[in-house]
Amino acid sequence: MIIGIGVDIIEIERVRQAIQNNKNFLSKLFTEREIDYFISRNMNSEVIAGNFAAKEAVSKALGTGIRGFSFKDIEILRNELGKPEVILHNGANLIGNKLVENNNSLRVHLSISHNNSSAIAYSVLEGEYYGNM
């Protein structure tokens, strides 16, 4: 059963400027594994903006926005084929588990795309709905 959807779009230039103007931008919002991935992609602003939009989309699908947890609690990684995968930690994981009957049944689907100016992410949460939020 679908229990949440979220979408976010961001201007890539805003992310590029944030990286240039704030030396702590990446470390405040992204985990070490995410930053390692960015480095492997030559710190590509489109990739970083896509991950940022993905975190926002997942937070909206959880129904809370970024309340009760930090951006680092939503980790966006890639599998061996490059497909984005979501790992929820700490507060985000607690909120996600409150939505489903069985803590292991929450599945987070994610799609990320970008063009020259914007990055967009769409997230769908799936599981056995518990509805105790």
UniProtKB/Swiss-Prot annotation:
Enzyme class (EC, first level): transferase
Disulfide cysteine pairs (residue numbers): none
GO cellular component: cytoplasm
Cofactor: Mg(2+)
Transmembrane feature ranges: none
Family: Belongs to the P-Pant transferase superfamily. AcpS family.
Name of protein: Holo-[acyl-carrier-protein] synthase
Organism: Clostridium perfringens (strain ATCC 13124 / DSM 756 / JCM 1290 / NCIMB 6125 / NCTC 8237 / Type A)
Gene name for this UniProt entry: acpS
